[in-house]
Amino acid sequence: MSFTALIDITRPDADLPAEGAIPVLNLPERQDRDLWIPRLIHAKKPFAIASLDAISQEEVTRLAETSRRRKLPVAILNAYRLIPVFARLREVVVSGCLGKMNAVKVHVPAAISAVLCADIALWLLPAASAENLSAASDNRIAVAVTGSNGRADAILDMDARKASLAVRIGETHREIAVPQMISAVTAERDILSNTLPAAHRWPLLMHADDAASAIVMAEAFTTNGKK
């Protein structure tokens, strides 16, 4: 059973969504977002941005500050979190089978968003920094997490559109089946429509302050000449 409906806002003159409906803003023009975002904030209405590419860094920073201050959930869709191989990797980490997490490494292909890769690193290990990112030599996003009991490696090959996940604990090595390269957007929208925000954010989705932190981390990575 859905808790609410989703309303796609793709034009500036749309009506304010009905009570309970969650708006997903897909407005490429800054002036249109400048019209809609204050309206939704004033109405204390949780909402989502369709993509991080559709919003400026300045807007992300301001949204993060506003959502914290007003305790208003603001999600940003089209993240990498719910791509199946990374979602399963998160399940492995949260299960505790790897023990205490102490390291994460994300290899970032040149053509891939460093911000979204940084968000993966922070999602898996909140203490991660730019040092946890490295430039990939091919078009694969490779994520390695190490805990006190073992290690897990997730690889998403963007060219072959294939994914793999392997877990090693002691002498035991296991390949975990994951769906191949599919969009995470459907899963993100399902979360928006089928769950209620907890502690002022939707579980699993990238929040505005997550995006702000990932931007800072990615900038440090790029400034250091690693991408």
Regions found by a protein language model. Give the residues of each.
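C-terminal helix-rich "cap/oligomerization" subdomain common to oxidoreductases
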Residues: 2-3, 21-31, 38-39, 72, ...
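Short acidic low-complexity segments
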Residues: 11-21
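Beta-strand-loop-alpha-helix segment that lines the small-molecule cofactor/substrate pocket
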Residues: 22-79
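NAD(P)-dinucleotide binding in Rossmann-like oxidoreductases
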Residues: 134-193, 200-205
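Structural motif
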Residues: 7-11, 25-30, 49-53, 78-79, ...
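Rossmann-like dinucleotide-binding domain that binds NAD(P)(H)
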Residues: 105-150, 156-160, 209-213
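A contiguous active-site-proximal alpha/beta segment in oxidoreductase catalytic domains
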Residues: 5, 54-112
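A general structural signal for well-ordered alpha-helical segments in protein cores
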Residues: 33, 37, 60, 86, ...
